[in-house]
Regions:
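Short beta-strand segments within Ig-like beta-sandwich modules, predominantly Fibronectin type-III
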Residues: 286-289
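Structural recognition of the beta-strand scaffold that forms the well-ordered cores
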Residues: 3-4, 10-15, 40-47, 71-73, ...
């Protein structure tokens, strides 16, 4: 009846919620690490969070379960975490409301968009309490049809960053399908480079206050911007590990403007010559060489 972002993905339900405590969640995350190779675990997604409905003073990424989520990424598993639903339109308490473990350093923290692609009023904003910009990206999380736990086969409409986060995990699964060797670092770099940049709209409403004092991108509302699944998948599939471009300041000063790039091309028939070569450094624009 309803189709998710990655309908061919295999799911593993790790029970770490919600009658227990944070230690149960951490044990579930550790189980994913320990069984990564056995079950081929590429992605972990979690929509858990510590909800305080107030400005945080301890969401600095150093809590035990935030560090555990960093360990999941360090084990080579792409990880998406919910930003939290604590904004609520509060002028003062709206900023610095990222939930733990969404304040972790290495995972991708996901904000929520409404169906009209506006930032959801409830979606938690940064900074973290150690002044890092969060979230990292925003996806649709409002009015999402999801299985109804109260029925055997029914569906119900749900809203929250808890809905946006598994959507981002589904997009990640498509990226892994395009490139089975995709690393968490590459995943995050693609988000930084290819998200659709969004402007912060205040709309004369204190509920849309600007939590980004200095940043333009990433910002504390959308992160790097709105997720672009097509661009993400295309970028993941185009990563060529035979191409190695490296440069340091001393070398650049020595050679001036005479720079050389060595690599391999593909897709052309034997005997054909390339008509154009383009180079992109980091998340910058493609430039013709």
């Amino acid at each position: 009846r309803y189709v998710g972002a990655a309908p061919g993905a295999h799911l593993i339900n790790i029970l770490g919620c919600c009658d227990g405590d944070i230690e149960d969640v951490m044990q579930g995350a550790q189980w994913a690490i320990d069984n990564k190779e056995k079950y081929g675990i590429d992605i972990v997604t979690s929509s858990l969070g510590e909800q305080q409905f107030e400005v945080h003073i301890d969401n600095d990424g150093n809590s035990a379960w935030s560090r555990q989520m960093d360990m999941v990424v360090e084990a080579g598993i792409i990880t998406t975490l919910s930003a939290g639903n604590e904004f609520g339109g509060a002028t003062l308490a709206g900023c610095n409301t990222i939930d733990s473990p969404g304040d972790a350093q290495l995972p991708v923290t996901v904000a929520s968009l409404d169906k009209d692609l506006g930032l959801a009023i409830y979606s938690s904003r940064g900074y973290t309490s150690d002044f890092r910009v969060k979230p990292d990206v925003a996806t649709i999380g409002s009015s999402i049809m999801a299985p109804d736990a109260a029925t055997q086969d029914g569906y119900t409409s749900k809203s929250g960053t808890s809905m946006a986060t598994p959507l981002m995990a589904g997009i990640a699964a498509l990226m892994v399908q395009a490139n089975p060797d995709l690393t968490p670092t590459e995943f995050k770099s693609i988000i930084a480079a290819d998200s659709i940049e969004r402007d912060i709209q205040l709309l004369d409403d204190p509920g849309f206050n600007d939590c980004s004092i200095l940043e333009s991108r990433p910002d504390n509302e959308f992160g790097y911007g709105q997720a672009d699944p097509t661009a993400f998948v295309e970028s993941a599939g185009s990563i060529d590990r035979s191409l190695n471009v490296s440069m340091d300041i001393e070398t650049m000063q020595g050679i001036g403007n005479e720079s050389y790039v060595h690599g391999q091309s593909s897709g052309a028939s034997l005997g054909q010559s390339a008509t154009r070569v383009e180079i992109r450094v980091g998340g910058g624009d493609w430039k013709e060489a």
